Amino acid sequence: MTSGKKVLYIIEEITYFTLLIFAITTYCGATSYWNHDQSKIVMVASCSAIVGILCVPLVEHILKINFSIFVDICIAVDLILSIILGEASNVYYRVQNYDKFLHFLGTLQFAVLGYSLSKFFLRETNKGSHQLFFSLMFGFFFAVAIEAMWEVYEFSFDSLCGTNMQKYIPDEFISCVDEKGNYTCSDEEIAAFYATKEGHHFAIMDTMYDIICDTCGSLTGIIICGLIFKFKPSLQDEIIRSEERRVGKE
């Protein structure tokens, strides 16, 4: 691991550990950075970031590869956009379609990463034909699968922690939900909302739009890979390298 990566990891871990402390103190009532429900989301997101950052060198060790600093920078930027800006600064709720933009951007990056992984291992084994087509398909489905797991992640914490990551609770009813997740507003208000087309589709709309954005982002990612890496194959070596090549270069 290069010194640049070590510094980046340390800064990220300190940042999200600090954010976690702020979220815990807010949840306990000692500070008031967010409301009670938002502090839970920030806690979950901060813990996920802390674990996720540590998983990057673990994946490198298991697969015996080295991601370029470009990959780590992309991860750092994504975490800033989603956690620090999106959740901690409430940009998700202030900027329309901000969540959809991040889904599109995330799957685009995962498609490029999946493509690069496939090309790397195919190049290492030097087996098989039509490697470009296979790698493009792998990149597409790799990105969609990662984002599908993200939806499972959101659903799991919504169910276990009472958060609203999947936006299944309408904004106008957020203040009417108790600690057990039950509505405290009148039955007439609830019935009036869910009797409409918007109401009985509401619970799945956010997730389905996320999946659509994921698919579009992944498709865009493999198109970019096909256009750029087809004519500049040397760029593939800038994303993933084997441990042996890195050591030899050093």
Predicted regions located by residue number:
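Membrane-interface helix caps and helix-loop-helix hairpins in membrane proteins
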Residues: 32-37, 62-65, 88-98
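Cytoplasmic-side transmembrane-helix entry/capping segments in multi-pass membrane proteins
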Residues: 66-77, 100-103
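Alpha-helical transmembrane segments of multi-pass membrane proteins
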Residues: 53-57, 78-83, 143-154
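Alpha-helical transmembrane segments that form the membrane-embedded catalytic/substrate-binding core
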Residues: 103-110, 138, 142-185, 201-226
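Conserved small/polar residues in nucleotide/adenosyl-binding loops
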Residues: 244-250
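N-terminal membrane topogenic signal
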Residues: 1-17
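Membrane-interface helix-boundary motifs at transmembrane edges
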Residues: 2-5, 34-38, 57-70, 124-130
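Membrane-proximal helix-loop-helix units in multi-pass membrane proteins
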Residues: 85-140, 155-162
